[in-house]
Amino acid sequence: MKRATVALLLLAVFCCVGAAEIPDLTGTWVLIQVYPQIAVLPLAGEVPRSSTVVQFVDVAQDGETLTMRDRYCFTLVDDGTPLVKTDIPEAFMAALVPTPRTAVLRATEEGIAFDAANYVEVRGAVLDDPLTDPLPIDPVDPRVIDQDGDGQPGMTVRVTVLGIVEGETYIVQRVQYRLAGWVIGPDRIEGRIEWTDEQVVLAATNPLLEADTIGRPDPDPAAHRFLMVRVNPAWTCETLRERLSEILKGW
């Protein structure tokens, strides 16, 4: 009987060894996403291009399930060439009001896995089926909306080419992404992004900017990555901009 009791105790111990404990991730986080691609830009040809999207995420937790509410701050675009400069205005970012996303935590012997469900966001248009409906190609299409409120169709992006050709492009976009990674600690999550995007230029103030940018994701999966870091709830987007290099140090 004594041996049986000892055996049961040992079994109970070994069955629990290696199982990581689900942490409490409730709070305010910053989410930084890097989207690298190979793009074909006007007058510049094929170049490595990347967009870094920076936003706050308010996380609520129910056991292993997270509800994530995003608040976009800014997007930094590296066009991969000094010949082209793309600027995403503050009004563009302020107009984005994403719906809540969900993520699931899973305890494994390697640690806590983080898996956020596939998320679809359409910008500058309202589609019956955001996932499969084709994007509008005409600025007078009734599905097109002036989402950033500047009196122009779709969303406005500023572009400069060669320092002399500059203007605004009015676009619609569809972005899909899924995050998968690991909880590094109670204040840090890292992982990779699976994503696709579509963009249509509806119109532009300069005819040279009316061509749609052609691009494809960078073939290196490790280059598509994200970082989540817990921050003070009192932080603003300006605080985040000022401390971005500090947050990214060593990543």
Can you say where each PLM-predicted feature lies in the sequence?
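Edge beta-strand at a domain terminus
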Residues: G163-E190, W195-W251
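Predominantly extracellular/secreted and cell-surface proteins with exposed
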Residues: T52-I184
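Positively charged n-region of N-terminal signal peptides that target proteins for export
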Residues: M1-A4
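N-terminal helix-cap/turn-to-beta initiation motif at the start of protein domains
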Residues: V17-V30, V183-G185
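Bacterial N-terminal signal peptides
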Residues: A7-C15
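Short, hydrophobic/proline-enriched secondary-structure or compact coil segments at domain edges
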Residues: T26-I38, Q61-D78, R188-I193
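Surface-exposed strand-loop-strand hairpins of Gram-negative outer-membrane beta-barrel proteins
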Residues: L41-S51
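Outer-membrane beta-barrel proteins
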Residues: I38-V40, L202
